[in-house]
A protein has these predicted regions:
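Substrate-recognition "cap/lid" segment bordering the active-site pocket of phosphatases
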Residues: 19-23, 49-101, 105-114, 128-132
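The feature marks the mature, well-folded catalytic cores of soluble enzymes
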Residues: 156-207
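Glycine-rich phosphate-binding loop signature in dinucleotide/nucleotide-binding domains
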Residues: 38-40, 91-97, 153, 187-189
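Metal-dependent phosphoesterase signature
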Residues: 2-30, 38-40
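Short, glycine/polar-rich helix-capping loops at beta-to-alpha or helix-loop-helix junctions
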Residues: 123-134, 157-158
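Substrate-recognition element of Asp-dependent hydrolases with the DxDx(T/V) motif
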Residues: 28-58
Length: 207
């Protein structure tokens, strides 16, 4: 009973203040506008309670998002695939042409459980390494990185990674391009570095 009372108080307070210090990541609105212009339908699935999720999406994105599902009574939360499959059905989409984009391990696991292609965004709350380990098929480091995935498809990076590690190369994932540059600078400082040789696309695992 105390938990129910606290939850009701929280929802009442959050309902009045949920826009405080809340704003879209820079570049997201532009990406959504481009997707809409190109006929891509967007839905949102959140573990935030349903009325709040709908209010936030409507306020910040309007008709750029077609459907929003939040937490609903008697419906399991992510990473259970029930809600995302319901959302996909309502949108009239199919698994083969749908990208599930998220910023957490829970999102990646939801995509895997639903049989969808998982795209991890590394500007959120989890590292690129965690997103990849949780099932991300590809990573985006800034919002504009998402657009080529819709236009050209998602490369199977795991094949390239497997091929490269087989040739003695190592893989590191970074949250930002600046982190990658800093890593290379620190690793190579004071060392003589040379590179040579070549690999075919087939050797990298691409057809």
């Amino acid at each position: 009973e105390m938990i129910d009372t606290c939850l009701a108080d929280f929802r009442a307070f959050y309902g009045e203040h949920m826009m405080n210090r809340t704003h879209p990541y820079e570049g997201i609105v532009s990406v959504l506008e481009t997707l809409k212009e190109n006929g891509v339908t967007v839905g949102v699935l959140s573990n935030k309670y349903d009325s709040a999720a709908k209010a936030l999406i409507e306020h910040y994105f309007g008709d750029l998002v077609s459907i929003t599902y939040g937490e609903r009574p008697n419906i399991p939360r992510k990473p259970d695939p029930t809600s995302v499959l319901q959302l996909l059905d309502e949108l009239g989409g199919d698994k083969e042409t749908t990208l599930y984009i998220g910023d957490s391990a829970t999102d990646m696991q939801t995509a895997v459980n639903a049989g969808l292609t998982a795209i991890g965004v590394a500007w959120g709350f989890r590292s690129a390494e965690e997103l990849r380990a949780s099932g991300a098929d590809a990573l985006a480091y800034e919002p504009s990185d998402l657009l080529p995935l819709f236009e050209y498809g998602v490369p199977d990076v795991s094949k390239a990674e497997k091929a490269l590690t087989g040739y003695g190369f190592g893989f590191h994932y970074f949250a930002t391009k600046d982190e990658a540059v800093s890593y290379l600078r620190d690793t190579c400082a004071g060392k003589s570095v040379s590179m040579g040789g070549s690999m075919t696309m087939k050797q990298l695992g691409f057809p």
